[in-house]
Amino acid sequence: MTELSSPNLDSASQKPRISTENPPPPPPHISIGVTTGDPATSPARTVNQIKKITVLPLVFLIFYEVSGGPFGIEDSVKAAGPLLAIVGFIVFPFIWSIPEALITAEMGTMFPENGGYVVWVTLAMGPYWGFQQGWVKWLSGVIDNALYPILFLDYLKSGIPILGSGIPRVAAILVLTVALTYLNYRGLSIVGVAAVLLGVFSILPFVVMSFMSIPKLKPSRWLVVSKKMKGVNWSLYLNTLFWNLNYWDSVSTLTGEVENPSKTLPRALFYALLLVVFSYIFPVLTGTGAIALDQKLWTDGYFADIGKVIGGVWLGWWIQAAAATSNMGMFLAEMSSDSFQLLGMAERGMLPEVFAKRSRYRTPWVGILFSASGVIILSWLSFQEIVAAENLLYCFGMVLEFITFVRLRMKYPAASRPFKIPVGVLGSVLMCIPPTVLIGVIMAFTNLKVALVSLAAIVIGLVLQPCLKQVEKKGWLKFSTSSHLPNLME
């Protein structure tokens, strides 16, 4: 992806320069690629003193926002067998992950502020639809984050059975959520370092397992489609692939905290894409090729059992520990993205300005509290229910993003794009067709219960925005647009 970078386009002759319409003051987010932080800081901590995220931490933050490793992909084998699981993790990135990552690189470098995709949609379709984008993306992110305490405990319960149900499980979810929320509160730079350390620890056991499995591999096992009498469970298969290979755009809500985003963001997305795809393909090849297939065993936590068979008890325990730490990393990355998105929306006047307040560690503490509360409320749902509901809401937001991408290409063809996908308007339309078709397929396989719940959530957003406008009009809560941000409206 880095090879696709293009020089900035000179848009001085075009009337609506997207970066700014009013004469730009010195503060940061006006010009694409400026590396200083948000000017709204306390006197004791000036903008230049704020540490920004560099390439390596950003790679692992993206890795955890999208993946976190092969934990949770087991259902793809259970649903469809080894062959379709392997093919899915090879082909699916070309249909979905690469287009989404490219769009994120282009749009994220155009608008290096924490509103991310909310800002993109607002410029293309207006503030009402910008708010809807923010609502469904935040809600799907919180739903997604509710999975990680569940997965964390699922991997530990084989070694600590008491965590399997009842009060101990509920208490463990609460303690874990509070502890990780506090780490988010302490600062994004700390979260970035933690993501790197956790990522290395989570990936290493699968590297070891892959090498140890070589003498036991039987390639013929990879060609099995499904041994189940009912055939392929397409709904579970597609939702598992989609959940494990989406959310590339989540990093856009952190671009205001990134050092030199015009260069750092595309590079980080490229490296993270490779890391994610390889972290799926090799464990699936290892697990299905080295051990006789029993599809019903391929559920959450099965990689630990595979590790015990291939390398011994020590490797199984290492994978269990890696799964636990991986879920911690995913929680941290997702909550960072969700909370900074709320901050970005507040800076744009879409939410009460209290959401724009930062702690002394420069973190959006109100957004963190809201996101953590949502995680606790939703954590009682089952894994598959959460995945299906989150996927459907995310699909709605992605449709808005694809429309926005094409519309901005048409509306502002000469605008400054520090990273530009080398296609024209027609190419941008064609690039969005395969993932849009995939969205339709996923929706078609969604059961009625999940569809109704997701539709209700969308309707809440449609009503919530006018209600907030009325609250602003009545003066019950204060809304304001940060002065350092560019004017998006013509």
UniProtKB/Swiss-Prot annotation:
The chain crosses the membrane at residues 53-73, 83-103, 116-136, 160-180, 188-208, 231-248, 273-293, 303-323, 363-383, 386-406, 425-445, 448-468. Disruption phenotype: No visible phenotype under normal growth conditions, but mutant plants show increased tolerance to paraquat. It is a multi-pass membrane protein. Residues 1-21 have a biased composition (Polar residues). It comes from the Eukaryota. GO terms for biological process: cadaverine transport; polyamine transport; response to heat. Keywords: Cell membrane, Membrane, Symport, Transmembrane, Transmembrane helix, Transport. Residues 1-38 are annotated as: Disordered. Coiled coil: none annotated. Its main location: membrane. It is found in: Cell membrane. Pfam families: AA_permease_2. GO terms for molecular function: polyamine transmembrane transporter activity; symporter activity. GO terms for cellular component: plasma membrane. Belongs to the amino acid-polyamine-organocation (APC) superfamily. Polyamine:cation symporter (PHS) (TC 2.A.3.12) family. Cell membrane polyamine/proton symporter involved in the polyamine uptake in cells. Possesses high affinity for spermine and spermidine and lower affinity for putrescine. Transports paraquat, a polyamine analog, and thus confers sensitivity to this chemical which is used as a herbicide. Methyl viologen is the brand name of paraquat. Plants over-expressing RMV1 show hypersensitivity to paraquat. This is Polyamine transporter RMV1. It comes from Arabidopsis thaliana. The gene is RMV1.
